[in-house]
A protein has these predicted regions:
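C-terminal functional module detector
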Residues: 1-140, 144, 157, 344-348, ...
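Compositionally biased, intrinsically disordered low-complexity segments enriched
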Residues: 153-155, 303, 464
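A metal-dependent hydrolase metal-coordination microenvironment
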Residues: 126-127, 133-288, 295-296, 320-336, ...
Length: 508
């Protein structure tokens, strides 16, 4: 599980090695910064209403380009709210390349005892430096393309094991990365419980409306924030799976795997029932991490399952099989999407990261009650969904694009263009045949592989039309369109392990 980790909950046990009578305190900053952008740096504080402390001093050290810059500040700041997000200064210039950041902060508890920590105060974790990549140039996507993170969580997702990021903080991080949009896909089961007392039931309809009203509104030049919901619902076997619903106006109940009802873990609604609701509002709906690799404990305690062909029902717009990292969940989810394409459907692929805040890295509970760990596999804004818009991004234009026939590319860095004669959108249409272009920023390595797949009429599987190994930063290629091609799609990888893939493009 990826998140700002909740360490205080003990499951009614008398003791846990993760429990400290201090608030959780984590230093965070975006993992990447677009050229010339200011990098916001935060001290994120959770549960200080239970464990009040006073922030006394902060020292920030940044190492980049062979130089070290630092700044120090003294405070007399009382921390006693459920959440605090404290801005910290960034010392030194905007040095291109990797910037390593370390923050030493000193606090005083209620008994007057002073303690110092580096980057966080979480038990069992070493204080690793934050790594911020300042890009030398913008990502190489042509004008009109805009990118977003379509699966992430804010502070409205809060429960016994996790808490998410502040929406305004996440928007500043999105602006730093030049994200055009992001979806606050907070858990359906968390809306049914009070804040900050997340074990006290509340009215989920009222809380969901408050959530929608609280999100930052459209503002020129800033990332668009999409109100959304990650709905727990029942698959063909009656097991809990997750469905991303973008900008549906009403709350959709789903507490099956929320962990607060004990063994009463059956889904509240089926996939079909949820899609019936979204079809009425026109809200885009996507299968979330459809092949996550569910362990035995989650299957038993939370009745969790995965998506299969029988679950890909009408009014489902696509599949989010890229969930931050590249692993078996990505490969098996992509295989499910391809199998759906071969059946004649043209659902969109989308990418997200399932970040709960997690601007620089994610904190995980690796062993409940006993051990934490950190990973960079689920960082906010890392795996992106790129869409083409004819106008300035707004909540309405992005919602419309995701629900319709829009040119789409998934990427964690490189650009990949696939153009085919007769395609429905201008961004995917060539004058004749197949046109390819792949480019990668220097920071992400050279293009080392480009593959083109096609479904030829009468065949049960895709054909591999091209398997090129260019080893170049900018590469283009033309080839003939095979007879009987029903769709084509393309993928690319770089020498540093970054990748991009297109949606399925139909020749006409």
């Amino acid at each position: 599980m990826n998140r700002y980790a909740e360490t205080h909950y003990k499951f009614r046990l008398p003791w846990s090695p993760l429990h400290r009578r201090l608030p959780e305190m984590i230093v965070d900053a975006p993992w990447m910064a677009a050229p010339g952008r200011e990098v916001p740096l935060f001290l994120c504080v959770h549960d200080a209403h239970h464990f009040p402390v006073t922030l006394r001093a902060v020292r920030v050290v940044v190492r980049a380009g062979g130089e070290m810059h630092k700044t120090e500040m003294t405070f007399d700041l009382r921390l006693d709210n459920p959440f605090h997000w404290i801005d910290l200064p960034w010392p030194g210039p905007k040095t291109v390349g990797e910037n390593l950041v370390d923050v030493l902060f000193e606090i005083e508890d209620g008994k007057g005892r002073r303690r110092k920590f580096v980057n966080h105060n979480l038990p069992t974790l070493a204080p690793q430096s934050l790594s911020v990549l300042r890009m030398s140039a913008a990502l190489a996507f042509p004008s009109g393309w805009t990118s977003g993170d379509l699966h992430c969580h804010t502070s409205w997702s809060e429960d016994p094991v996790e808490w998410g990021g502040d929406p305004d903080v996440m928007r500043r991080a999105a602006d730093c990365q030049n994200l055009g949009f992001w979806a606050a896909t907070d858990h359906s089961y968390d809306f049914a419980w009070e804040h900050p007392d997340w074990l006290v039931p509340t009215d989920p309809v009222k809380r969901f409306r408050a959530f929608r009203d609280s999100l930052p509104k459209d503002e020129p030049g800033r990332s668009v924030v999409l109100p959304a919901e990650e709905v727990s619902c029942g698959n063909r076997d009656g097991r809990n799976v997750h469905l991303l619903v973008i900008d549906h106006p009403e709350y959709l109940p789903g507490q099956g795997d929320g962990g607060r009802r004990g063994l009463r873990n059956k889904p509240d609604l089926s996939i079909g029932q949820v899609l019936a609701e979204t079809s009425r509002s026109g809200a885009p709906a996507f299968a979330a991490h459809p092949k996550p690799g569910i362990g035995l404990v989650q299957r038993l305690l939370f009745r969790r399952g995965d998506w299969d062909h029988a679950d890909l029902l009408p009014h489902l717009h696509g599949l989010q099989f890229w969930n931050g990292k590249i692993g078996d969940d990505f490969r098996h989810g992509r295989a499910l999407w391809v199998a759906d394409l071969l059946r004649g459907n043209r659902r969109l692929p989308i990418a997200g990261n399932d970040a709960h805040g997690d601007l620089n890295r994610a904190t995980q509970v690796s062993r409940p009650l006993f051990q934490l760990r950190q990973t960079r596999r689920h960082r906010f804004g890392h795996a992106r969904t790129w869409i083409y818009l004819d106008s300035e991004p707004t909540r309405t234009s992005i919602r419309t694009a995701l629900a319709g026939d829009t040119a789409t590319i998934l990427s964690d860095g490189p650009f990949l263009s696939l153009r085919v004669g007769g395609a429905t959108t201008a961004q995917e249409r060539s004058s004749s045949g197949i046109e390819l272009r792949a480019t990668s920023p220097a920071e992400f390595g050279n293009i080392r592989a480009v593959r083109v797949y096609a479904h030829i009429k009468g065949r049960e599987k895709e054909d591999l039309l091209l398997n090129a190994t260019p080893d170049a930063q900018d590469w283009s290629h033309r080839m003939d369109l095979p007879s009987g091609a029903l769709y084509l799609r393309a993928e690319t990888e770089t020498s540093k392990g970054h990748r991009a893939l297109t949606r399925a493009v139909e020749p006409r």
